[in-house]
Structures are given as structure tokens and as C-alpha cells.
UniProtKB/Swiss-Prot annotation:
It is an enzyme of class 3 (hydrolase). This is Uncharacterized hydrolase/peptidase y4tL. The keyword Hydrolase applies. Its EC number is 3.-.-.-. It comes from the Bacteria. Pfam families: Creatinase_N, Peptidase_M24. GO terms for molecular function: hydrolase activity. It comes from Sinorhizobium fredii (strain NBRC 101917 / NGR234). Keywords: Hydrolase, Plasmid. The keyword Hydrolase applies.
Amino acid sequence: MPVIKGPQVFPRAEFLRRLNAVKLEMGRLEIDALIVGSSADITYLTGYTAKSGYVPQALVISSNDEEPTFILRRQDAPAAIHQTFMDRDKVIGYSEALIGNPDKDGYDAVVDFLNERDGANKRGVGVQLGYLSVRSAEKFKTRLPSARIVDCTHSVAWIRMIKSDLEISMMRDAAAIADAGVQKAFEVIRPGVREADVMADVAAQLARGTNGKAGTDLASMYFCSSPRTGTCHIRWSEDVIRDGSQINLEIAGVRHGYVSAIMRTFSVGAPSDRLRRIHDAEVLGLEAALSTVKPGATCSDVANAFYRTIEKSGFQKDSRCGYAIGIDWSEPTASLKDGDMTKLKPNMTFHLMLGNWIEEDFGYVLSETFRVTEAGCEVLTKSPRQLCVI
């Protein structure tokens, strides 16, 4: 029996709008075909969220075709038929003989598809070279010898940086789920409780969702507890929570690929003077950064508003203050850092990430996900900006 089409997260017209924007960029670059390998970009253009990108797969966009063609491993083709907006004949499953083959892989199936189309090997072809191994990139060049290969690694990412209102609604739902995860952490972090049990409850909340909207995936979760608060990307340990512990939590809600992230710091018992001082300074810095957000301001403006504010309290932050966020946790485009002159536009979304790792054994975290509005910003995450004292 053929697999049925699943419920579509966005209407067909929304996907066609996105594809048309990509085709305009293809015209500017004078390419007739674009090979999209980024899983996040494929989600944006088709609605596909299955985790099959660990083997070669590609979305082929032709300037002459309304719908793209998705070429992926044959066993994953039913998921693509089920999840995407495209007709089933636009999903092509390649043979299992290309899996674990030292001589050929799924990208050979993509090149074969291009070569089967009239003139495909003689026109401009855009390829996301940054996502390919050297060997795979070379394959496109040698097997399409007459084609002008154009690197389009981040072309789609820059287009999807400005969200539609439908996408913003999805990110609001994801932000509410992230907030529910923070609240759950506040409820279950207690002395004597295993860190693993805390995160099991938080993960369950992130999957369960809130307001009738389920979390559709689990993003990475970071639980950096004393004496590991100077680290930023480690998981929970096998230890238990103790009186006097500090916990730096970073989680995200996910709705159909769209991510809204949040960070909060917890103190089990009275916080130290140092922790309270950096918390107070960073809240002021966060408010200064958010007050700078408006169309026409630059990412650098936002970052420097934060840096200048915390410096008045004697603190510095060496790392960037955030990054574009949307499909997947971090979009490979703009950063909230000194010198990034990307101008803010309405419906851009960012994770204002103010984690500050001061010493090897001490750091602090605070963050919000926000969108740029016509007049300023809307903070999507709503958890209180407090030092969460247990």
C-alpha cells in the first residue's frame, strides 16, 4: 500500500513562495539548477524533518519546474512522500547499493539525475559546497565537466532569515514550550535529586509541549552544574544536586523544525555575591541590547549595547551575544557580535545568548529568543528574568 500524505504544517502556497524567492536568487546567480543538501534548508523548502541527512541526500531545484525533486535513500523516500508538500513523483529513492559503497554514493544518483535532463551538464549549477566533503564536491565538478559550478552554501539560509508570519507563529509556540521546560526545571531541581532525573522530566515536558501544542523534536539540552559552570556545552552528569550548587540550563522548544531557545541560571540555596552581581549586570545588559533592536540597526549595534552595559559593572564577555535562529538552533548567517554589520529587518529572529564563561569553574547564563518588529522587538520567550533560587 502506498504511504498517505500527512498533515501539512504550512499551506502549499507558503512553500511555493519560499521556492520562488530561491529561484529569484538563482536567476541573479545565473544558475538553472540548485542542489540543496542542508537539512535545515530542505525543511524550509519542503516541510521534511526526518533525520536522514547522515547519508547523502539532496533537493534539486530547477528554474523551470514548480516543484523541486528530492533525491534520497530509498528506505527514507516514504517519509519524504508523507511529510513534504510535493507530488510523490518528485521524490526519488536511490538504491541501497550506494550505501557503504567505497566508489559511489547518493550524490552519484543526484548527478545522474542532472545528466538525464536535457542540457543539465552544460548549465550553471549551484551546489552547497560547504556541506560536502572534498571528495563529494569534486564529484560534482568531474561528473559535470561542462557545468559552471557555483558555491551556494548559504544562499537559502539568507533567504529564510526573514520569516513569514506563519513561521513566527510556529516560533511563538516553540518559545512557549521552552518556557514550560524552564518552569519544569524550577519545579524538580532539588537537593538529592539526580541530575539525570531532572533532565528526564524536562525532556518529557519539552516533548509534551504546552497549550495543546506538542514538541515535535528534542533539541540539545545542556545542564552545566557546579563545579562545571565554566563549561558551556556539556550534558547532565551522574551526580545528584547538592545544597549550594549552581546550575546553568540551556534548552529549546521545537515545533516542526522551528527552534526557540532559552537559558536560565539556578542556585540551590542563597546565591553567592559574585553570582548575584553578574546576574544583575547581565539583566541590565540584556535590556540594553533589546532596547537597541529595531529595523535598520545592525547586529553590531545590539551586541555593543550589551558589552558597554556590563562593562560598567566590571564584567566582560569574550564571545558573541547571539545568532540568527529559526529552523535548527543556529542559522549560519548573522551573529550578534561587534563588527557584524547585518542590518535588522522585520521578522528576523535571534537567540540573544548571554552566556558568560568567566573562569574555568565559573560561568553564568541568560538568554531570550526574539523577533525584530516594525518598531522594535518582540521577545518570544517569556520566563521571568530572575536568578532561579531553589
